[in-house]
């Protein structure tokens, strides 16, 4: 596989959004449009890629830098894709892969509680569901999403994050 630029990576982030309802922990998943180039019709979680427009036209935190650019970008993607606001965003894990076009990609996966809003999907998604971890197993999820939901489920139920392993 030919890599375009070994130092250049596309950066994306995803959010495992949860809410506690009647003693159950539920997670929002969305079904991608059938017109999507990658994983059409499959189920996933909200997220997207970091673009310079996400921060370049905002006030810098220091003379030369923008702090929390990725978090602001992820919050914007969540609002855009499902119209929700979330609470504190916590780091879960990172994923790296190389797209078929040779572009290296870094995905940072986060988890956060639902805070407010009513779900309204954008044009990139055609359906959504709030599901428990066992219910999520019934959906055609993009590879790895179920395992990430399982990790968050264990964390939220008081199991040690360090004891959760993903095929290592």
Question: What does each model-found stretch correspond to?
Answer:
Residues 1-23, 35:
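Acidic, metal-coordinating catalytic segment for phosphate/diphosphate chemistry
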Residues 9, 66, 70, 104-106:
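Residue-level preference for beta-strand/loop junctions
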Residues 12-13, 69-70, 126:
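Short loop/turn microsegments at loop-to-beta-strand junctions
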Residues 17-19, 31, 109-113, 132:
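Short, well-ordered beta-strand micro-motif
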Residues 24-76:
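Conserved Nudix-box catalytic region and its N-terminal flanking loop in Nudix hydrolases
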Residues 41-43, 48-53, 109, 121-168:
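Nudix hydrolase/Nudix homology domain
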Residues 77, 81-85:
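Short alpha-helical functional segments enriched in proximate histidine and acidic residues
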Residues 85-88, 93-118:
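Active-site-adjacent beta-strand/loop module that shapes the phosphate/pyrophosphate-binding cleft
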């Amino acid at each position: 596989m030919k890599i375009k630029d070994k130092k250049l990576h596309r950066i994306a982030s995803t959010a495992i959004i949860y809410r506690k309802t009647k003693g159950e922990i539920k997670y929002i998943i969305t079904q991608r449009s059938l017109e999507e180039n990658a994983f059409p019709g499959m189920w996933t979680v909200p997220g997207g890629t970091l673009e310079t427009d996400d921060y370049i036209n905002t006030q810098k935190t220091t003379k030369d830098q923008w702090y929390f650019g990725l978090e602001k970008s992820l919050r914007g993607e969540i609002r855009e894709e499902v119209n929700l606001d979330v609470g504190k965003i916590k780091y879960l894990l990172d994923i790296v892969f190389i797209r078929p076009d040779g572009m290296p990609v870094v995905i940072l996966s986060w988890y956060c509680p639902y805070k407010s809003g009513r779900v309204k999907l954008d044009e990139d998604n055609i359906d959504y569901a709030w599901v428990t971890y066992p219910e999520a197993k019934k959906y055609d999820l993009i590879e790895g999403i179920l395992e990430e939901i399982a990790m968050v489920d264990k964390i939220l139920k008081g199991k040690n994050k360090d004891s959760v392993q993903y095929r290592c």
